[in-house]
Amino acid sequence: HDFLYLNKAIRDHRLKLYNRLQESDLLANSIYTFWSFDNPIRLDKKYELPGIDPKDYPRFGKDQDITELPYIDTVCSIVSETNDNDYEVFMTEKIWKPIMAQHVFVVHGNYLYLQKLKEMGFKTFNNYFDESYDLEQDPNKRIDKIVSLCADLKQKNWQDIYLQTKALRQHNYDTMFDKEKLSLEINKTINLFLEFADSGQVSS
């Protein structure tokens, strides 16, 4: 599969990107969810957390848990963050999951989201594909750039990309678990996520 693209709560910016990706037929070979009211698209049971019924997913909780198979069966995460405003960067468990899974990622989030990640010591994939969407302050134009990027990514040689980014992805994984290194920048969300990982609540 191409993308892993998970959407839970319906938000305007998520609906806009989802519709654009569907209109461009970019999700045809992807694993994705979208919780619309009339026709929710859910994960196949084999990709869901153990003990979870995809048709009765809890509205709250379970967001910090992670299961490995969806990341193994896809090459790139489209991270659908909580908001896309241009005045603050708000990171949630949605970005830490692909980092923990050593997955390549594209982020639909705030203006300068990737820049903030870099300030925290992480690396992104600007040497391998266009990340100029992060510099686009207008949310609608940012979506345009993400859609264009996703179309380009579907044509990439992913075996080469994963070989070339192995050290980068390992660096991000190590950085995520280096609490001392991140002590000045880390936010409450990743600390909570690490508590789940350390206590064995992260499913594999």
Annotate the PLM regions.
Residues 1-79, 85-92, 96-204:
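Pol beta-like nucleotidyltransferase catalytic core
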